[in-house]
C-alpha cells in the first residue's frame, strides 16, 4: 500500500508540475505575441544544453551512489558536485559577461540552480520522501508561473528577457530553500581532499557517459535554432507553440506508462505476457496513433485562436503534425519497455542514437525546403526506429531463451 501511495503522490506531483506551464501558455502567447514566443523558444533551447555540461547528470550520480553505497557519505558527492557546477558555471558566466550577452548570462545562472534543484529532488526521491519531493516540485512550478505574471505585468519592454529572469529567480529561490532544509538534516561530517578527489572522479565517470544520452534529447531541439536563423521569429513562434501544445499528449502518455510499467514487468516475470503480445499491442497501437491528429483536424481553428490569441493563425497545422510524432511514442514504449525489463541499456542507447541520426538526416534535408515540412523530421525519427526495435527485441528474446 505504501508503494501505491508514494507512486500516486509522485504521479500527482508530476502532472501538477507539468500542467501549470501549459495553463500559462494562453497568457504568454498574448503577452509575447508570435515573434516574442519564437524568440523565447530559441533562447530556452540553450538551457538544457547548459544543464548537461554544468550538471553532468549529478541527480543520477547521487541516486546511484545512494542505492549502491548508502547515505553515509552522500553529502560528499553532493558537495563535490556542487563545487564542480559552481566552477564550470562560473566560467560560463565569465564568458557571457565578456561577450556582453545578458540573456545568456541569465540562462547559465539559471542552469546552475536548476542542477542544484534536481540534486535536491533526487535526494528526496532516494529517501522515499514523496511529499517533500512533490512539494518542492510543485513549489518550483507555481513560483515560476507567479513570478512570470508579476514580471510581465510590471514591465512593458524586453518581455522575453523578463520571462527568463522569472525562471532564474524561481530556480534560485526554491533551490536555496530546499538546500537549507537539507543542510539542517544532514550530518556535516568533515571530509579530506582525497575523498573529494574520489567523489569528483565518480561524478566525472558517471556524468561523462550520460552526456551522450542526454545530448540526444538536446539535438532534437536543434530545429528551433535552425528555424530562428533561417526563417522568421514569427514562423518559429507558430512552430514552437504547436510543439508545446502537442507535448501535453506526451505528458499523459508518459504518466500512464509510468503507472503501468510495474504491472507490465510483473506480468513479464510471471510469463503471462510475452514478447509476441507486446509486438501485437505495438502493431495495434498504430491504429491509435493518428486519432489525436484527426480529432485536432476537425477542431475549428477559431477555438485555438481564442485560447492562444488571434496572431497564432496557422498553429493548428503544426499541432496536428507534432501530435502524430508524439503519438508514435505509444508503439515505441511497448517495445522499449521490454528492453528495460531485461536491462538492455546498450540496445536502448543504440536505438536513441539511431533515432536521433534519422531525425538529423531528415532535418538536414527538410531545413532547405519550407518551415511547414520541418516537423516531419520528428515523425520520420519516431517512425524509423520502430522496425529496428522490433528486430532487437526479437533477438533479445532469442538470447534469453538460449541462456535459460
Swiss-Prot record:
Keyword Ion transport: no
Membrane topology value: Multi-pass membrane protein
Compartment list: Cell membrane
One GO CC term, this protein: plasma membrane
CDD domains in UniProt: MATE_Wzx_like
Transmembrane segments: 9-29, 36-56, 76-96, 103-123, 135-155, 162-182, 199-219, 236-256, 288-308, 319-339, 366-386
Keyword Nucleotide-binding: no
Keyword vocabulary terms for this entry: Cell membrane, Membrane, Transmembrane, Transmembrane helix
Annotated coiled-coil segments of the chain: none
Family under the similarity heading: Belongs to the polysaccharide synthase family. HI_0867/HI_1700 subfamily.
Protein name in UniProt: Uncharacterized membrane protein HI_0867
Lineage per the UniProt record: Bacteria, Pseudomonadati, Pseudomonadota, Gammaproteobacteria, Pasteurellales
